[in-house]
Curated annotation (Swiss-Prot):
GO biological process: 'de novo' UMP biosynthetic process; pyrimidine nucleobase biosynthetic process; UMP biosynthetic process
Name the UniProt record assigns to this protein: Orotate phosphoribosyltransferase
UniProt keyword annotation of Transferase present: yes
MF terms (GO), sorted A to Z: magnesium ion binding; orotate phosphoribosyltransferase activity
Binding site for 5-phospho-alpha-D-ribose 1-diphosphate: 98-99, 102, 104, 128-136
Enzyme Commission number(s) of this protein: 2.4.2.10
Keyword Transferase tagged: yes
Catalytic activity: orotidine 5'-phosphate + diphosphate = orotate + 5-phospho-alpha-D-ribose 1-diphosphate
Pathway terms, separated by semicolons: Pyrimidine metabolism; UMP biosynthesis via de novo pathway; UMP from orotate: step 1/2
Essential cofactor(s): Mg(2+)
Amino acid sequence: MSKSASRARLFEIIRRRSFGRGEVTLASGRKSDFYFNLKPTMLDPEGATLLAELTYEALKDDNLDFIGGLEMGAVPLAGALAQISWIKGHPIAAFFVRKKPKEHGAKLAIEGLPRGETLQGKRVVIVEDVTTTGGSAMKAVESVRETGAEVVLVLTMVDREEGATDTFGAAGLPFRSLYKASEFLKA
């Protein structure tokens, strides 16, 4: 399937499984009359594959060591991308950032790294399923930067176009999206 055909097919899957209209309160606290819940798309076999392939294509030239983001939205995507990247011969390892460190066990804030391995000096992309203001992704950025990693960009599946570009710009971070909310609102 061509890249444009994959993008069109994924758009339809997101529209059917993950986009809705109706009043909701977003993670940012804002009210909205439409919403995206990408988990049904990210956990669907075809949706997960298309998301991972399109994300890999968007990132393959960025010379990345790791992909990760804040739980829960980044976990399915990071895992699927790690798998696709290995299949394509350019492995990008995955991790996720806990909203708060576990209070038991190893008490980790960042999960998925082998024992003794760190993100220090590594090139990292932060991914997110849906981005509104960028606040949630910035929490992940801050946690990852504290490890000494270089966060090279933030990539979201859907940009709600409500301030994230400004948030990441102020932090000196490039920001990319696979889709814009306006594409779904016009469909």
